[in-house]
């Protein structure tokens, strides 16, 4: 890891390096920045992490993260129960919410089908999705999944599984670029893609 760094610093670098988008070099830079600013950055970050670990939970309805269960979105009576938007991860849900265009409910799958990575339907929240679709309130399931091979494979699988429920199954229009991830898109692109969705 870091030459002449103590085990505590090496452990910090190793843990930071495991975060998405950070490798060993970025982890080292982040660790140094945190240690240089202990009072203004490291201490508040430590408190925020402890707070998040103690209070944040997974919503038993949609799979989002919140401090309450059900989450604020699932508890919002103003939401349209007829529309159910399926996303890969919580980050995609947050991206949809930033756009402000969608007023329905969400379902977080917790990943995508991937033969290469050995991820099958049993590893995702597919059963819960089918249960919600069969519940009687949902009339349309919107598949807001990445325009990647795994995303499209998952979308087609879900469309096949949802067909017997009788709900309309749509996908976001191709305002979402191929290979794109919702979390990286601007609000206007997400809003346009949502308006131009089509049958799956």
UniProtKB/Swiss-Prot annotation:
Biological processes, Gene Ontology terms: DNA recombination; DNA repair
Transmembrane segments: none
Domain of life, per lineage: Bacteria
Gene Ontology MF annotations: DNA binding; zinc ion binding
Keywords recorded for this protein, A-Z: DNA damage, DNA recombination, DNA repair, Metal-binding, Zinc, Zinc-finger
Domain annotation Toprim: ranges: 82-177
PROSITE patterns named among the record's database cross-references: RECR, TOPRIM
First and last residues of each zinc finger (C4-type): 59-74
Family: Belongs to the RecR family.
Function field: May play a role in DNA repair. It seems to be involved in an RecBC-independent recombinational process of DNA repair. It may act with RecF and RecO.
Protein name, as recorded: Recombination protein RecR
Taxonomic placement: Bacteria, Pseudomonadati, Pseudomonadota, Alphaproteobacteria, Caulobacterales
């Amino acid at each position: 890891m870091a030459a002449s760094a103590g085990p505590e610093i090496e452990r910090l670098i190793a843990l930071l390096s495991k975060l998405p988008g950070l490798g060993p070099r970025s982890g080292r830079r982040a660790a140094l920045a945190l240690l240089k600013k202990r009072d203004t950055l490291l201490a508040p970050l430590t408190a925020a992490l402890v707070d998040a670990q103690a209070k944040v939970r997974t919503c038993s309805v949609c799979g989002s993260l919140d401090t309450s269960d059900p989450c604020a979105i699932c508890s919002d009576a103003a939401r349209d129960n007829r529309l159910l938007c399926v996303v890969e991860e919580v980050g995609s849900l947050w991206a949809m919410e930033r756009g402000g265009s969608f007023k329905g409910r969400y379902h977080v799958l917790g990943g995508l089908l991937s033969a290469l990575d050995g991820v099958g339907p049993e590893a995702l929240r597919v059963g819960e999705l089918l249960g919600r679709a069969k519940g009687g309130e949902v009339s349309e399931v919107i598949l807001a999944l990445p325009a990647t091979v795994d995303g499209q494979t998952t979308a087609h699988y879900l469309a096949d599984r949802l067909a017997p429920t009788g709900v309309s199954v749509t996908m976001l229009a191709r305002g979402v670029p191929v290979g794109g991830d919702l979390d990286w898109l601007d609000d206007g692109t997400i809003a346009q893609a949502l308006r131009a969705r089509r049958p799956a």
